[in-house]
């Protein structure tokens, strides 16, 4: 087996040869910069065929002309992705440079989610999360046999994306149909281990949060957006900010919640939370999402649902999960038999587009939080996220002086026993929660309303509505919202 750039970069380095070599091959980067690999990164393929190109610069620092034969050696392959060089050889004059191109061509409907053959599909006996990649190395083989072969790593993660929106139509009595419109993804057998199948989930929208600014790299404060006031008032405390643009994967945009109690009864019901962010999550290891739940209406949280991951010998794995704990740190429902669910509600054998995505979902049984099924089915809750650099974003939560998370004065609220909005797919006895449902043009989600619960739900940052999660849409369009009225006049869906 050959280890690809996704795992080992260019591979081993012959240090003496690298130091004595007089010809360099590198990639032209943005704004006249240079990088050492032809990485196309994550490629969201929305058109039938996507073509991207990189320019390779060959710099000859010697006093003699050099000629190299060009070829591409694949290490890992992905169906639907191919690489092409625009020429078979290159000649570079003494003390000068020359260039050639490599093109990546991705056919949207041929893409499959295949795993690197050097990577185990499981970790700690669970299907792992992974991204498909097509990678290898450009070989520059010298015509002069006394010279060394040059290698440039090539890498991409291509995935098909859906283009789905929705229309809500009233069907009478505060019920309605959400009909999906657009193009889904159906590459391979639906839900297969190497397939891409678009998925949809629906939630009650209860939280909305504005985008955080990026911190000033010198001061750690938000960058100014206007000219400074020549006679300013005393400076206020700086607000929260994201350390970098990419760290906005912890920056909360939307929060949704739903329950399937109307289908299965409260004892067998699950709570589902969705957290949309202002930037895609690169890896679950660097961002933690928590939902804090007040189970007895005393203003303090009693339960925490949090994203984490299984470890293997102390090392993190690609098996992200959701666990629950009480205020004393005891696991739910017990330390001896904790309930553990997968982040995004499914193992890595079903593609839920977990990596490089701007939304995650968390699922947990209501019965593991007994206060919710006793006297207090309506609970207050807040969401807190922590980024790679330790930055914190709060919606309905705050951080105490000693760094402990607490609920804020203003929180969201929801009723697990009598959900305000119930979303289902299928008819009659075949109806199931509209969570990770296969989606395509014409898919219909039924919506029913419990008016009493709906009017008592409490939102933060915006109005009530429906939060649609199109898992496989392009980043930035995965979360879509449908505004709804307050319901105080008895009308929710009209």
Labelled PLM ranges:
Residues 107-163:
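Terminal connector regions
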Residues 185-220, 237-493:
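Surface-exposed extracytoplasmic segments
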Residues 81-125:
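Intrinsically disordered, low-complexity Pro/Gly/Ser/Thr-rich segments with frequent PxxP/GP/PP motifs
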Residues 9, 52-60, 102, 136-141:
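Buried hydrophobic-core signal for structured, non-transmembrane domains
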Residues 61-80, 289-295:
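Short acidic, flexible loop segments centered on an aromatic residue
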Residues 74-89, 110-114, 333-347:
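Short beta-strand and strand-turn-strand segments in soluble, beta-rich domains
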Residues 58-64, 75, 143-145, 278-280:
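Short solvent-exposed strand-capping/beta-turn motif centered on an Asx-Ser/Thr pair
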Residues 15-62, 87-92, 119-125, 164-190:
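Beta-sheet-dominated interaction scaffolds and their linkers
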